[in-house]
């Protein structure tokens, strides 16, 4: 995994970024924060796609946030739906892709995720991990999600851990 700079979408330079990782690491809430930041502070046109349909309450909660920040949301479950959602956001500055939490050892689910990310045409795949997780669990996640082309790492709550 390389250290990458900040996301820098701009007019005519669309960037598509997916958040992947185990359940409960903060993928969804951090994508909402990024969407709001780029939409409100940098006046970027932002679209959000969620492929996390495992719990309807999650989609409803996400829709509440995207409505609040006026960020369009597309919900997808298949590669075909992902292609359609990408077409909906053609011309947007930043497209953020939320994915379902997957156990790093679930290679079948990770292969399906990889196919969805190909259809999304992502530029970056951020692996989202808990900053207070064990070194073993982090290494397992890096290895497990490596096949989807991880380009960066996001560690929410980094400021909350003790050194």
Positions of PLM-derived features:
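Primarily NTPase-proximal linker/entry elements flanking Walker-type ATP/GTP-binding cores
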Residues: 1-54, 63-79, 83
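Catalytic-core segments of thiol-dependent peptidases
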Residues: 19, 23, 93-99
């Amino acid at each position: 995994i390389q250290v990458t700079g900040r996301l820098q979408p701009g007019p005519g330079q669309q960037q598509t970024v997916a958040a992947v990782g185990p359940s409960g690491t903060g993928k969804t809430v951090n994508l909402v924060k990024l969407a709001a930041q780029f939409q409100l502070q940098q006046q970027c046109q932002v679209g959000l796609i969620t492929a996390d349909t495992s719990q309807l309450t999650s989609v409803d909660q996400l829709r509440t946030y995207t409505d609040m920040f006026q960020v369009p949301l597309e919900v997808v479950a298949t590669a075909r739906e992902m292609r359609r959602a990408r077409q909906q956001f053609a011309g947007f500055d930043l497209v953020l892709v939320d994915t379902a939490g997957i156990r790093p050892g679930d290679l079948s689910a990770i292969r399906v995720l990889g196919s969805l990310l190909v259809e999304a045409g992502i530029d970056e795949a951020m692996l989202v991990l808990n900053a207070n997780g064990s070194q073993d669990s982090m290494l397992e996640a890096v290895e497990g999600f490596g096949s989807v082309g991880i380009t960066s790492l996001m560690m929410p709550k980094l400021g909350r851990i003790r050194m």
